[in-house]
């Protein structure tokens, strides 16, 4: 089973019906069918929440949270995973990555998974992790 990490960029594109939404929807269908495992760091979940709250409202952010909960995506906590947090901190210290993006990259590295994103900021780690580029 292929394992993929979704960056917040991918889910925001899906929810806002941007050009990459169709590719993300295909991944979600594969996860539902059991052929792919999709992961999302809780830090990136929080990024989706706060972006929605800033742009729309807290009510809209809560709705988006419910929608994510209904998808076949495993939310990955960071509270007890110092290996994951350490890798994110290394990426943040050595690359030009936002902190939340560093968690998505670290999760992909630690789980040996492909990161699915369209955020060009991840070019910083392209040689270190597998990236599935969305357009």
Please tell me what each predicted stretch does.
Residues 1-3, 71-74, 105-135:
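Acidic, PIN/NYN-like endoribonuclease modules and their adjacent C-terminal/linker elements
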Residues 6-7, 40-41, 96-98, 119, ...:
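Histidine- and aromatic-rich ligand-binding microenvironments
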Residues 27-31, 68, 91, 107, ...:
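Hydrophobic helix-cap positions at the C-terminus of alpha-helices
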Residues 74-116:
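Active-site neighborhoods of divalent-metal-dependent phosphate/nucleic-acid chemistry enzymes
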